[in-house]
Amino acid sequence: EMCIRDRVKQCIQSFIYGVNTPSRWGTQAPFTNITLDWTVPNDMAELNAIVGGKEQNFKYKDCVEEMRLVNKAFIEIMIEGDANGRGFQYPIPTYSITKDFDWSPTENNKLLFEMTAKYGTPYFSNYINSDMEPSDVRSMCCRLRLDLRELRKKSGGFFGSGESTGSIGVVTINMPRIAYLAKDETDFYERLEKMMNLAARSLKIKRKVITRLLDEGLYPYTKRYLGTFDNHFSTIGLVGMNEACLNAKWLKKDLSNEESQIFTKNVLNFMREKLSDYQEQYGDLYNLEATPAESTSYRLARHDRKQFPNIITATEKGNTPYYTNSSHLPVGFTSDVFTALDIQDELQTLYTSGTVFHVFLGQKLPSWEASAKLVRKIAENYRLPYYTLSPTYSICQSHGYLDGEQYKCPICGRKTEVYSRITGYYRPVQNWNDGKAEEFKNRKTYDIATSVLHKNHHETSCNVKHDEANDAKELMLFTTKTCPNCKMAKMLLDKANIKYIPIDAEEQKELTKKFAIRKAPTLLVPKQDGTYETYDNVSLIKKYIEESQK
């Protein structure tokens, strides 16, 4: 057993060091994001495991110990850091917080939350109160597009993308400039609509060009593993909503003010409606993103200040200008994390991708228990989909990891590197662009000891069984032509000699809408009371087959 552990750890260590090796243009390491499950997801639990391309006689739900072994090895290496004690920048791990997450003091839990407290490495996906499911990261090709006005969530975390999906391109709209130039609120919306129309057209043109290049064989690798850009989003984002509220002649208040929060909600809902219009007009997927704006927030503010000297940025005149990311609060607004969460929870849930709440901490949390408690509180009381705990730490070349922001080593007096999160990943503050460096100076970190939870536990959503009867008393299997899981579901049902009515979900849209089918494959099994039991992935379909044959 020790030999197996050592081999697993060696393999993962090789992977981690590999992805942190500069191999991109500009001698950069590739942006790498991985999603790790803490429990076996239900869309895979009942499927036979595949090892080396061959199906095994055991299921993924039987591999819990192997999951723990891989998770433990990964976290141990991330906690150890490199030879100088620096945390690894990549891969950025995303962990799923589900309703059945085990919060007990297990060895792996201690390691996970120690890593979070020390380096702030992981992202957490909130599957308790948000409208996401753990299977979303794998099921984009199975989603049905019945309502062209429906805006879908882009799965896969802050930097990553789920299987078979991604983004054609991103256009970020400069909100402060629109607000500064607008005479009144009506003029603001007219200017915003004009910019969004331009963004949508540009993304459509880009989609046409790269699709043509894909079809002509110029992207052979992409063609092999992806095949099509049909499930890719055309992304429109925004920057500087806080400064837009300050520049708006009818507001002149930042986002900590309730009037500005209401205006921001209205703006985001307006943008969502426009994206639905574009989906109908162009037939493509569009999404609203809280774009990271790592350099954009500084570049746009710098250009605006040159062109419009009286425009309000996040800093006073004479200081380096920058805009606050998307619809985030002013960086120096509060040290109470729950006050900030109460406001952001109402705004971030209106985006369909890119949104994340960073719990910026001045130093390492005192214990893994404190880290776990905070992660749990956020997941159980808020709806925002992604969040991080982001402690600041320093690195001395001689003495390694130092807690908090220390520009000189307290032991040897040498200059250190101060690390903090810049729009999603950790970098030495000394290497940030001028705008982000100014933001770091202005940033007020959250004091967990004095933060008070102000709201009650959200009602968690449950899956509701479809209760509409149909004349047919046979099983109905909703599939699509391109979904590989649909072929597997048909094969399993045929092999078990179970009769069913095959329904092409895309061709028979009326029936698909009638039964509110959201993804393929979905099996509807009639019950005695005339309603249907729903099995909406191949794993659950396989479980139904096995139980029906007992």
Model segments located where?
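Intrinsic, low-complexity terminal and presequence regions
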Residues: 392-411, 417, 421-472, 493
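Structural micro-motif
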Residues: 515-524
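Conserved phosphate/anionic-ligand binding catalytic regions in large, soluble enzymes, centered on
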Residues: 29, 34, 230-245, 414-431
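Hydrophobic pocket-lining residues within nucleotide cofactor-binding pockets
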Residues: 178, 505, 517
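Local sequence-structure signature of Cys/Sec-based thiol-disulfide redox active-site neighborhoods
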Residues: 466-498
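Thiol-based oxidoreductase modules, predominantly thioredoxin-like and allied folds used
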Residues: 497-510
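Conserved catalytic cores of very large enzyme subunits
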Residues: 1, 5-230, 251, 257-411, ...
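Non-catalytic, surface beta->alpha helical segment in thiol-disulfide oxidoreductase systems
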Residues: 527-550
